Amino acid sequence: VLKVTPRVHVSKIELLDVEAPGDFKWHGGQLAPNGFIYGVPCYASQVLRIDPRTDTVSYFGDLGHNKAKWYGGILGPDGNMYCMPFAATRVLRVVTAEDRCELIGPELDGGGAHGGYKYHGGLLGPDNCVYGFPMNAKTVLRVNCITGDVCELPLPEDEPFNGGKYKWGGGCVANGCVYGVPSDSCRVLKIDCRRGTVSLFGRLPAQKNKFQGGVLGGDGGIWCVPCDAAYACRIDPVTDDVAIVGTLPSQHDKYQGGYADA
């Protein structure tokens, strides 16, 4: 675990529990209401727990040694972390108040290699449901944090570019909806949380890995962070207009994720 302690001119960086073996062990995490940080098991067989007050690291759960199990965890209104199934076939719920984890919902199918590479991260909607962004899956994943119900919302149509893989990466909540930022998809994903519907809109160039993540700007627009795209993109959540903005260098892997200063 990497710890960074920001200071005015100096940052202290240290590794905790450096002997833990393996690669790609955890992918994402959350600070829970109890003050502990929980890591999402990707290749790791256990959930990671960090106590930032004592700099101690511990693990719990017995989740097996399969690869790429879960990508990204979202903190629900119940204080639990919901992990999105990548190659795993079920949602993992980390019950932070008890330091235990459990699989919830039905077995999920998915297209693609190694169990599907189904969902990559997600967001908590205004309806207390977590929505998982489809990577290779043909559905949006919805987890009701209050009832524990897990269901799939089908996409209205296929996204044919690149075989329907790596469709959306990251997103934002705005105007009562969850918006998915196009990665290989040529259209924006829109989940209307009140109606429980999924739609696609806009038309962007057919290019792989266009954007990675998005932020809600002070102008009310969702700004997509350019990864391989040579431009930024602005989504208007009121009108559903999609605009290409600016000109950037054409090299790959420029940026991933961003932050909007309030």
Q: PLM ranges: what are they?
A:
Residues 36-39, 81-83, 130-132, 178-180, ...:
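Conserved beta-propeller blade signature
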Residues 42, 86, 135, 183, ...:
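Short loop/turn segments immediately following the C-termini of beta-strands
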Residues 12-18, 58-62, 102-108, 151-157, ...:
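Beta-propeller fold detector
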Residues 5-9, 51-55, 95-99, 144-148, ...:
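Short loop/turn segments that connect beta-strands within beta-propeller blades
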